[in-house]
A protein has these predicted regions:
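Conserved Rossmann-like nucleotide-cofactor binding loop
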Residues: 14, 37, 164
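Residues at the starts of beta-strands that form the adenosine-phosphate
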Residues: 5, 28, 223-226
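Flavin-binding catalytic cores
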Residues: 239-271, 327
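Active-site substrate-recognition segment that forms the wall
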Residues: 201-236, 253, 275
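A short coil-to-beta-strand element that immediately follows conserved catalytic motifs
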Residues: 178-182, 198-202, 258-274
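Conserved mid-domain beta->alpha element of the FAD-binding
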Residues: 11-32, 158-159, 185, 215, ...
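C-terminal auxiliary extensions adjacent to catalytic cores
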Residues: 371-393
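Conserved N-terminal helical subregion
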Residues: 2-6, 48-190, 233-250, 393
């Protein structure tokens, strides 16, 4: 008897990566996305060797090389005076040590690469404007109902629907969101609008007082992507993501150096996110339902591992499904397999944010001095991330 398709909720990075991996192995899938079209947000993402290896193994090497940037170096600098605290060769080191390069790209470019590859295999399996309403687990299948009251049956339902996951809400009805007192500003600037000192600068992390700012080129160097995080006491809006006010952005980073000021001055429409912690995500899985990516384990953007972790989830889950003909019974194994690494990534990301945001002058001096001295002796940035980058899903 032919198996019912696996139902994937969400056409983001985790959902599309999972779908592509399964389709390449002749597993039927259906993808349902609540938005009316494929995501077109211009936010930048890091694709470190642990993510690059996945894309290459999916046959996407040429495509990602044609759209993304390979940074030569990365720098850590003081937010106020621009003093260079640490500098690390990135791509030669990554390719020599981990066999795969480090990319920086626009999120929508990666989404479109995955989307186009899926459409080559089957252009009739992605449905837009379908928001999950509920699902019911039956003996041999799962019945899924959408907000348009259409119903679909599948063998499994996989929630790849991000931080506001509807699948997670059903699996974990007691889970609640809590504002982390951090907001993130994002934007892109045309490289032609910026002065030479900025266009020639390596990807840089600027470490300030209860704030930090990161920028790097994307889209083969035609655009500069930035993300800035700052501590806030409250987030009043119902939406976690919205267009931001440029004057508020200037106010949040008002005491910055001239480079950050110029980047902010040239951004057209900045976006801002309230960063929320999701409490009590106890269950990633039931017998026929599973959540992956941000739906299962949201993390702060301060380690640049959100997209990579989502791709890791997708590939590992695809292998579990492929190795078990009765895969409906093996979803619990996924959580057991992934939880340790994910928790370590979340803790490391939170730790990075604390280091980037240090306010105490004495502690800041000690840490900044330590970074400066250690960087002269050992590749401190790469050493800190080695356990992440060497992972091969």
């Amino acid at each position: 008897m032919k198996k019912k398709p696996i139902i994937i909720i969400g056409a983001g990075i985790s959902g599309l990566t999972l779908a592509l991996a399964l389709l390449k192995n002749n597993i039927n899938v259906l993808i349902f996305e609540k938005e009316k079209e494929i995501e077109q947000r211009g936010a930048g993402i890091n694709i470190s060797p642990n993510g690059t290896s996945i894309l290459y193994n999916l046959g996407l090497e040429k495509k990602i090389n044609s759209l993304a940037c390979k940074p030569i170096n990365i720098e850590l600098r003081n937010f106020n005076n621009g003093f260079l605290l640490a500098k690390q060769n990135l791509n030669n080191s990554c390719e020599n040590k981990f066999k795969y390069p480090f990319f920086q790209a626009q999120r929508r470019d990666l989404i479109n690469i995955l989307f186009d590859e899926i459409n080559k295999i089957n252009s009739e399996i992605i449905f837009f404007d379908y928001e999950l309403k509920r699902y019911e687990e039956k003996n041999n299948f799962v019945s899924v109902t959408f907000d348009n009251d259409k119903k679909v049956d599948g063998s499994l339902i996989i929630g790849c629907d991000g931080i506001n996951s509807n699948v997670r809400k059903i699996l974990n009805p007691n889970a609640s969101s809590e504002f982390s007192n951090i907001i993130a500003w994002r934007g892109v600037v045309k490289m032609n609008d910026l002065s030479k000192p900025i266009t020639e600068l390596s990807p840089t992390i600027w470490m300030g007082n209860q704030k930090h700012f990161v920028h790097y080129p994307v889209q083969k160097g035609n655009l500069l992507n930035f993300i800035g995080t700052v501590r806030k006491d409250e987030w009043h809006d119902e939406s976690w993501h919205q267009f931001g006010d440029k004057e508020e952005l200037k106010s949040d980073f008002g005491k910055a150096n001239t480079i950050i000021k110029e980047i902010i001055e040239n951004v057209d429409k900045p976006n801002k996110w309230g960063l929320f912690d999701i409490k009590f995500i106890k269950n990633w899985a039931s017998e026929k339902a599973l959540i992956i990516g941000d739906a299962a384990h949201p993390m702060s953007p301060s380690y640049g591992q959100g997209a990579n972790c989502a791709m890791e989830d997708a590939i590992i889950l695809s292998r579990i499904i492929l190795k078990n003909s009765n895969y409906e019974r093996n979803l619990f194994y996924f959580q057991k397999n992934r939880e340790g690494r994910v928790k370590k990534l979340q803790k490391s990301s939170s730790r990075n944010l604390k280091v980037f945001h240090i306010k105490n002058p004495l502690l800041k001096f000690i840490i900044h001095s330590g970074l400066y001295i250690l960087n002269k002796i050992i590749p401190i940035i790469l050493m800190q991330s080695s356990w992440i980058y060497k992972f091969n899903a």
